[in-house]
């Protein structure tokens, strides 16, 4: 479904590669964990998968198409990397704005279901600026899920959550995986979180998979 081949990234001004010759395949319905320390290259890899950064060399293909060759290749993706919501807009308005921005207004009817799934329906008219970190994480997750993507990229979704919050998020993702055969790449510092959720996991260190 998604194939990464010999992917490398060297940022301007650096004399080292932040990502070096990374290759990875993720099949349909597979949940793959990505574990590594800060600075290991997790976010760099995910940002290139999300097209917010371009690789120095190598390719990423989705369903046989190079993601950097067309504008709409990631149409079926749900991405949770950097904050994607507006703190001064209500949760409901954030989801509507996201869907309108991406031309997916047909998913408006899915907003209630998604917010109930992440346990934010009762807070739908509140603004994220006053939320706890965990609620902000779930707001970002709702945006990633609302259009029922076929592929999820989640960078450190468990950071800042207490054990109950972590388990709730794991349960949500498991539910989505069982309901629809969606593929996921999820990064974390904690192996235990990934073991509870993923089919397999890979280690990244110094920009390389080990």
Model-derived features: positions:
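Helix-to-loop junction immediately C-terminal to a conserved catalytic motif
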Residues: 50
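The feature captures the beta-strand-to-loop junction immediately N-terminal to the Walker
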Residues: 35-37
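Conserved ABC ATPase "signature" region
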Residues: 96, 100-123
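Catalytic Walker B motif of ABC-type/P-loop ATPase nucleotide-binding domains
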Residues: 152-156
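A short, flexible loop at the N-terminus of ABC-type nucleotide-binding domains that lies
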Residues: 1-4, 8-21, 28
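Conserved ABC transporter NBD signature motif
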Residues: 58-73
């Amino acid at each position: 479904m998604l194939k990464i081949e010999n992917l490398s990234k060297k940022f301007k001004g650096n004399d080292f590669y932040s990502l070096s010759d990374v290759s990875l395949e993720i099949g349909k319905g597979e949940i793959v964990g990505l574990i590594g320390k800060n600075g290991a290259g997790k976010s760099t890899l995910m940002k290139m998968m999300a097209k917010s950064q371009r690789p120095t060399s190598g390719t990423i293909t989705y369903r046989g198409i190079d993601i950097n060759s067309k504008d709409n290749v990631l149409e079926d993706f749900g991405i949770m990397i950097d904050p994607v919501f507006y703190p001064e807009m209500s949760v409901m308005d954030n989801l509507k704005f996201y869907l309108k921005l991406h031309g997916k207004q047909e998913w408006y009817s899915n907003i209630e279901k998604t917010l109930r799934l992440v346990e934010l329906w009762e807070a739908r008219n509140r603004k994220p600026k006053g939320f706890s970190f965990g609620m902000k994480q779930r707001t970002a997750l709702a945006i990633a899920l609302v259009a029922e993507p076929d592929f999820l990229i989640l960078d450190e979704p468990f950071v800042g959550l207490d054990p109950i919050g972590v388990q709730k998020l794991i349960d949500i993702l498991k539910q989505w995986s069982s309901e629809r055969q969606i593929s996921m790449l999820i990064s974390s510092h904690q192996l235990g979180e990934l073991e509870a959720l993923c089919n397999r996991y890979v280690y990244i260190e110094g920009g390389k998979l080990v």
